[in-house]
């Protein structure tokens, strides 16, 4: 998954889509500059959302500058690659990869286990640099590592709380924006938002991994809990996420963040088990043919490598954002 958070629709948010793109590509630039050129490929929507939150709650305006991302021959566009929230998101992204590889080396076997161990060794210098950067900002790195180490304990003692380690880690990561920006009064709301985000990430991954986990005999909470219990947990967590997002006092980009929340809900409708309106049902029913006719991109663009923008447009007419062949593009409910 490229991230739980859905990217905004380029048509519906045409005025603010450059903000998402500038944050996404600013994050990619930090990853490349600080942790190696290949590290830019780690850029993802969840980390971009974290960076955008910081840009939006900061009373000081972003430091936009014209730059390119992955294609030096592209036309420069506004990015922010020095804001504390962006550099924080980059550091936790690198550490997140290290955690993922560590989990894979523990859970997998054969070639995948070997590849995970090799990958961990290769990224070790970048991880060390990311941890050092986090420590210089008073981020509780050791505490988060301990939280993640408790994962198996939560799984063994209470499957319904198997999401606890991920929730606490995301909560700590998101709440640290308050420390970085000198906004201690926002820490509770940010922690609530991050914790809910982490729980949703955990349950979505578990939902997606049911078949491989069953095949390999790995723990999955869906094998140990009644579906109604899981549904209630997910829906209450989604309610926490949306309420926390609403409670934050944004100085800018509030419309974009609201749309991202709506688009994320639409993207995960089946997983969330939420009721859809009649209009949404009709829209989903007819969307596949329309999107195939229009080029299959659903009008999203995060976007870095293809949209920088040397690749030919698919379909006829439209801008890069309208015909972008980028990462998989989630369909927007308002197309």
Whereabouts are the PLM-identified features?
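Cysteine-dense, membrane-associated helical/juxtamembrane modules
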Residues: 266-335
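Primarily interfacial, aromatic-capped hydrophobic alpha-helices that serve as membrane anchors
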Residues: 229-272
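Acidic catalytic motifs of isoprenoid enzymes
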Residues: 1-192, 199, 203-218, 222-233, ...
């Amino acid at each position: 998954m490229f991230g739980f958070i859905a990217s905004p629709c380029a048509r519906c948010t045409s005025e603010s889509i450059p903000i998402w793109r500038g944050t996404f590509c600013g994050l990619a630039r930090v990853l490349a500059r600080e942790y190696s050129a290949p590290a830019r490929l780690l850029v993802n929507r969840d980390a971009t959302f974290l960076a955008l939150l910081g840009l939006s709650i900061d009373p000081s305006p972003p430091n936009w500058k014209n730059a390119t991302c992955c294609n030096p021959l592209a036309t420069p566009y506004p990015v922010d690659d020095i804001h504390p929230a962006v550099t924080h998101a980059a550091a936790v992204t690198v550490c997140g990869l290290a955690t993922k590889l560590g989990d894979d080396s523990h859970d997998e076997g054969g070639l995948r286990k070997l590849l995970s161990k090799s990958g961990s060794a290769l990224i070790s210098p970048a991880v060390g640099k990311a941890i050092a950067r986090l420590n210089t900002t008073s981020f509780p790195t050791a505490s988060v590592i301990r939280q993640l180490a408790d994962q198996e304990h939560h799984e063994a003692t209470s499957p319904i709380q198997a999401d606890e380690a991920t929730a606490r880690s995301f909560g700590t990561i998101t709440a640290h924006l308050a420390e970085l920006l000198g906004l201690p009064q926002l820490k509770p709301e940010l922690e609530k938002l991050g914790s809910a985000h982490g729980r949703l990430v955990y349950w979505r991954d578990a939902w997606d991994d049911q078949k491989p986990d069953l095949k390999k005999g790995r723990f999955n909470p869906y094998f140990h809990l009644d579906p109604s219990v899981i549904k209630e947990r997910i829906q209450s967590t989604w309610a926490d996420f949306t309420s926390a997002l609403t409670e934050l006092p944004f100085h800018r980009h509030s419309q974009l963040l609201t749309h991202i929340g709506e688009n994320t809900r639409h993207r995960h409708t089946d997983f969330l088990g939420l009721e859809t309106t009649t209009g949404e049902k009709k829209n989903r029913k007819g969307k596949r043919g329309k999107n195939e006719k229009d080029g299959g991109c659903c009008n999203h663009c995060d976007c870095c490598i293809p949209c920088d923008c040397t690749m030919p447009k698919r379909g006829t007419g439209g801008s890069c954002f309208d015909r972008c062949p980028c990462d998989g593009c989630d369909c927007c409910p308002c197309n």
